[in-house]
């Protein structure tokens, strides 16, 4: 595996999710380096705001705040489903150079305008009634991501992948605080049962072998462990899921190897996106004492 330093989290996520949709046919498991990063498409030249809606599942507490930005907090809560509306305002000055740089440059600003909750029944009825065109995708964010930031990133990925109404954000109760790493670790493990439940609902709504998962950083632990739990109920040769993408995976590499044979029958393809220049993963290795899966 060749090493490619200098990629940001945002660049890694866009690269991995683009690979996910572009390579949805059956094949062997893959490992990709930063050399495979595609250019980020920039289509808008107008400075007029663009509004996008992202469906979400969250386990966060409701704060009672009056603004969309503090609608959900960083504590554990009940399952809530709905849509977060994001407004993206392009910055014309940056757009001509954004797709020419070897690293990620935002070509606009994103604002969480509103949060609309819907019932669980209504939420899952809508995707089931839509024609199957693209692979549905569940995105699990990583450590230090609040609800607003998670919605903004999800809107960016949904736009780049052209997955309107097919992209689903799972927002577990990360604290959005750099110093609360161990708190986030507890919360991602607490969330595993709910991640498993959400994957099962997606399979029910879209069909077996159609669902893709992209998980980032600490979110990879939730994705992997949810699949381990699902393996107990899996029978037959057909995979339950289409593609699992693990980006900058903050999970013990040795533990992942132990689980790989367990989760492999459930997923048609597994892709790792790795880096040798990820400061967060280097710090995680120091804290835990063992290499992380997302490091080369």
Label each region the model flagged.
Residues 215, 219, 223:
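Gly/Ala-rich beta-loop-alpha elbow adjacent to hydrolase catalytic centers
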Residues 145-150:
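Short substrate-entry loop that stabilizes the transition state in hydrolases
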Residues 2-13:
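Bacterial N-terminal signal peptides that target proteins for export
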Residues 21-23:
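C-terminal motif of bacterial Sec signal peptides marking the signal peptidase cleavage site
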Residues 25, 29-118, 122-132, 151-155, ...:
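Lipolytic serine-hydrolase domain surface
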Residues 134-141:
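Short beta-strand element of the alpha/beta-hydrolase
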């Amino acid at each position: 595996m060749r090493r490619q330093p200098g990629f940001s989290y945002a660049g890694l996520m866009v690269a991995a999710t683009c690979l996910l949709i572009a390579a949805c046919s059956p094949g062997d498991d893959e490992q990709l380096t930063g050399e495979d990063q595609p250019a980020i498409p920039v289509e808008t030249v107008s400075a007029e705001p663009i509004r996008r809606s992202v469906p979400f599942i969250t386990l966060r507490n409701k704060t009672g705040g009056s603004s969309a930005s503090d609608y959900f907090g960083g504590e554990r809560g009940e399952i809530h489903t709905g849509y977060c509306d994001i407004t993206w305002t392009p910055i014309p000055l940056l757009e001509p150079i954004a797709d020419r740089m070897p690293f990620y440059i935002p070509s606009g600003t994103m604002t969480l305008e509103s949060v609309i909750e819907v019932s669980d029944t209504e939420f899952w009825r809508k995707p089931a009634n839509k024609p199957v065109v693209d692979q549905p995708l569940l995105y699990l964010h990583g450590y230090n991501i609040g609800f607003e930031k998670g919605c903004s990133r999800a809107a960016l990925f949904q736009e780049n992948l052209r997955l309107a109404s097919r992209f689903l954000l799972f927002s577990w109760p990360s604290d959005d605080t750099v110093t609360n790493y161990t708190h986030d670790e507890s919360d991602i493990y607490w969330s595993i049962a709910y991640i498993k439940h959400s994957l099962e609902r997606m399979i029910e709504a879209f069909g077996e072998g159609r669902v893709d998962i992209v998980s980032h950083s600490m979110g990879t632990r939730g994705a992997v462990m949810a699949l381990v739990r699902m393996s107990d109920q899996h029978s037959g040769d057909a995979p339950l899921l289409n593609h699992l993408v693990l980006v900058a995976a903050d999970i013990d590499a040795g533990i992942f190897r132990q689980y790989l044979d367990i989760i492999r029958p459930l997923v048609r393809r597994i892709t790792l996106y790795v880096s040798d220049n990820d400061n967060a993963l280097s710090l995680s290795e120091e804290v835990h004492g063992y290499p992380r899966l997302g490091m080369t």
